[in-house]
Amino acid sequence: MKIPVLPAVVLLSLLVLHSAQGATLGGPEEESTIENYASRPEAFNTPFLNIDKLRSAFKADEFLNWHALFESIKRKLPFLNWDAFPKLKGLRSATPDAQ
C-alpha cells in the first residue's frame, strides 16, 4: 500500500493549523492554583504509565534476546509481510542467543 506523501503532509499540516487555531480561540485564561491540579501527579498513576504491561514486555528470559524480540515484534505486527525484509531475516541466527 503506497501512501502519497504530499497529500498526507498537507492533511497533517491542516490538522496542526486547525488545532493551533482552536487553542488560541479558547476562553479566557484560568488562574493557576493548587486546586486546579490533581491531588497526585501523573507520574505516580500506575494505570497512566501501564507499568504492568512494561514489565511483561521485558521478561527476564526474553530481555535482549534478539531472536525472541524479533519473534515478539512479528507476533505484535502480523499484518506486515516479513518476507519483504530479507536483511532482518538474514541477521537472525538459526538458534536463539544464549543468555
From Swiss-Prot:
Question: What does the record note about the induction of this protein?
Answer: Up-regulated in situ in psoriatic skin (at protein level).
Task: Name the predominant localization.
Answer: secreted
Per its UniProt record, what InterPro entries does this chain match? KRTDAP
- Which keywords describe this protein according to UniProt? Differentiation, Secreted, Signal
Name the domain of life. Answer: Eukaryota
BP terms from Gene Ontology:
cell differentiation; epidermis development
Expression across tissues is: Highly expressed in skin and detected at lower levels in thymus. In skin, found exclusively in lamellar granules of granular keratinocytes and in the intracellular space of the stratum corneum. Also highly expressed in oral mucosa, tongue, esophagus, and stomach, and at much lower levels in bladder and uterus. Not detected in gastrointestinal mucosa.
Q: Where is the signal peptide?
A: 1-22
GO CC annotations on file = extracellular space; lamellar body
A Pfam family it matches: KRTDAP
Where is the protein situated, by its record's location annotation?
Answer: Secreted
* Physiological role: May act as a soluble regulator of keratinocyte differentiation. May play an important role in embryonic skin morphogenesis.
What this protein is called in its record is: Keratinocyte differentiation-associated protein
> From which source organism is this entry?
Homo sapiens (Human)
The lineage is: Eukaryota, Metazoa, Chordata, Craniata, Vertebrata
